[in-house]
């Protein structure tokens, strides 16, 4: 009888040690975090055949490919939208009109956007090309963030965590290494950069500079391998 009691106490101690919470709790393993698909809210912009033809024509001018499909993406480009809400980003991408910067069709877009609270919104399937980064639209998935600077996102824990968890799942889905998760400002140094139009060669944006992306990639690496 006494041996049974001692055995039950030992089992209870082991279970109690494994069920701790708070500061003593173990974080999820890398494999668990990498495999978790976060909730994704669909807010699909109109992308009819006309816009697809325009995207194929754009790809011909800039990449020498008459294609609108995004096959086997090789990298993920991180942006901030200079916008204060998801609806503002959606409305910028929704209408198919010449973009304000280069006056080309189709209009610009990114595939996803992360809200200030960390929620993920899907604008375009990652099997369709979007105009978000000159020289890389032929092979890159674009992710916008609500905010007006890199630091806006890096200093909002909920948004940063939501972004990291989503990008971890997305890169694992497509077999994209952490080194190929880049900021828009890093586009010109990408080995995948390709631009045939001389007017666009050397063009990039200031969002997500190298130093801030090093911080982002370091945090992403902490989530582990796929």
Task: Enumerate the predicted regions with their spans.
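N-terminal catalytic cores of peptidoglycan-degrading enzymes
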Residues: 2-9, 20-133
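Basic/polar, cationic surfaces and motifs that engage anionic cell-wall
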Residues: 28-52, 70, 149-226
């Amino acid at each position: 009888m006494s041996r049974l009691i001692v055995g039950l106490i030992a089992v209870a101690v082991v279970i109690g040690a494994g069920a701790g919470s708070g500061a003593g709790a173990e974080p999820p393993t890398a494999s668990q975090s990498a495999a978790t698909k976060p909730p994704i809210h669909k807010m699909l912009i109109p992308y009819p055949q006309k816009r697809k033809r325009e995207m194929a024509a754009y790809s011909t001018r800039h990449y020498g490919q008459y294609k609108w499909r995004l096959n086997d993406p090789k990298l993920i480009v991180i942006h901030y939208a200079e916008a204060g809400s998801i609806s503002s980003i959606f409305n910028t991408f929704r209408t198919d009109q010449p973009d304000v910067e280069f006056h080309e069709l189709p209009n610009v877009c990114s595939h996803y956007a992360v809200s200030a609270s960390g929620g993920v919104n899907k604008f375009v399937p990652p099997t369709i090309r979007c105009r978000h980064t000159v020289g890389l639209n032929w092979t890159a998935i674009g992710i916008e963030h609500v905010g007006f600077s890199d630091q806006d996102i890096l200093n909002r824990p909920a948004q940063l965590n939501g972004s990291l968890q989503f990008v971890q799942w997305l890169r694992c889905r497509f077999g994209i290494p952490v080194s190929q998760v880049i900021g828009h400002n890093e586009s010109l140094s990408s080995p995948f950069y390709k631009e045939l139009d001389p007017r666009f060669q050397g063009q990039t944006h200031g969002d997500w500079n190298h130093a801030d992306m090093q911080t982002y990639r370091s945090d992403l690496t902490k989530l582990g391998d796929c």
